[in-house]
Amino acid sequence: MTTPHTPDPHELAALRERYRLERERRVRPDGAAQYRDADAEFGYYAADPHTEGPADRAPLHDLVDVVVIGGGFGGILTGARLRQQGVARVRIVEKGGDFGGTWYWNRYPGVHCDVESHVYLPMLDETGYVPEWKYAPGDEIRRHAVRIATRFDLYADALFSTGVTALTWDEASETWLVSTDRGDDFRAAYVVSATGTLTDPKLPGIPGIEDFAGHTFHTSRWDYAYTGGTPEGGMTRLVDKRVGIVGTGATGIQAIPMLAEDAGHLYVFQRTPSTVDERANRRTVPGDVGAGRAGWASERRDNFLRIVSGESAGRDLVADRWTTSAGLLEKLLPSFRRHGDRHTFEAAYEAADAAKMNELRARVDRCVTDPEAAEKLKPWYRYACKRPTFSDLYYPAFNRDNVTLVDTADTHGIERVTADGVVVGGTAYALDCLIFATGFNVGTSGIHSGRLPVRGRDGVHLLDRWRRQGPRTLHGFTSNGFPNLIQLGTLQNASSVNFTHILDEQAVHVAALVAAAEADDALIEPSPASEEAWLAVLAEGAPDHEWFHAECTPGYYNREGRGRPNGPIAYPHGAVAFHRLLGEWREKSLSEVLRSRTVPRA
């Protein structure tokens, strides 16, 4: 590939203006309120298509050591690391019918991971498994989740098709009362929230959505009974169907090429095009990744994290589009490590960003034969405004006669849904099937959604307290007034594009906290002073990203165009440094969060 042209100041100014105009075409006054939850009258969009229904069982009223809310990789890894620390009674509560989390739910055609499988799949060293593909399909990932759960005996106490509805601290017993939608009221010495960020599907609030007389579903609940086929394709029941799909983000990029092959006619309704870089997926053998060496997977995973976090790494073991574009992730990740003078960095960043985006727009012209369609598919915004996507199949799908791209930018999305189809720009599109690839309520699942009330000491409601004074944690995990409650996620810690690595580091930390508390017959609870000190760490050196996201095209990164305010939301020196900090803290300062019990552990 030729070296990208570096734009001059006049070209950069022209790009800024084009980006502004394209953003204004898409910003809606209702912001994130344009979406609705898949609940109440729309609850069927979130129903589980992979199980016939919850298995009959009596409600539980027992006591466990640890309850983990969520059976995705966060919950599985927490359970596994707790087992390694000798914790016996671990109960994972999961809304789905099996382990897997987002990989249990997302089985749409073409589903793959967008991070290399040899770094994405956790515990490869421990299980001895070597992925079969550079970028694993969903089924391989789901099977690995089950492999880990089986290896660490996590099925023994697991509750599937069960949602936690309330967490209440009982001071008299110093345990948490856990209530579920299956009538359970059991107790746990510790609670770990691992509900993930890609679990609750969202729908566009299009007028008339409930009036559609055809078939409809969300991609995270794919209806193969209607389409036929499998995630590998073969949707033979669509051969005579007019299919519409709404959404061209990470899911749409993967599902659209498969639908294009099988549908009688496919209409793709696009508000904002994604960046779509090359994928170059292929089968792999152990020798490709040095899998014969002890610790090979941890080495590869650590190498990838260093590069995409802005650290030096010597050589690039993964060598894909994530790593070669790593410098542009600074605006995507609040916890990216930055170097040098701010002004110099921003100038160089803008030039590199423009060169990369010009390269990606040129790729559209090379892949799409129709100039009008190609122009609609070009992304006019900065690289980190949306999560990058990767596919070698997406653009060629628009060269097919049975695929129509419908641009909805000027109408701020589909105008309305009718019994027969949808209307965009005054044009009616008749459909037999309408599929929503509209994503999830990112970052608002579980405790943060408000649908899971958590009451700590003196009946204090966690979210009420945070609404009044802002989130208060130590390292993002624990909070004063909520003993033995530990949260996984991205709040006030560090994240990265390879989220399973982050989750595994968090699981190791959780297991160490629980093991220390058990050894000392103690409760885990930071002091208010510890929380304040951590807020100060987060605030010092926090990135100024507010202006960047305010200029971005609308999406979930900037609250649909409302911007993302600066603040103490993430550790500002990178995930590698954060993991190092946690390790040193566990060695030297963990006892600071241990408080003596007043009631003996049952």
Predicted regions and their residues:
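Aromatic pocket-lining residues of Rossmann-like dinucleotide-binding sites
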Residues: L82, M258-L259
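Conserved active-site neighborhood of enzyme catalytic/cofactor-binding cores
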Residues: T216
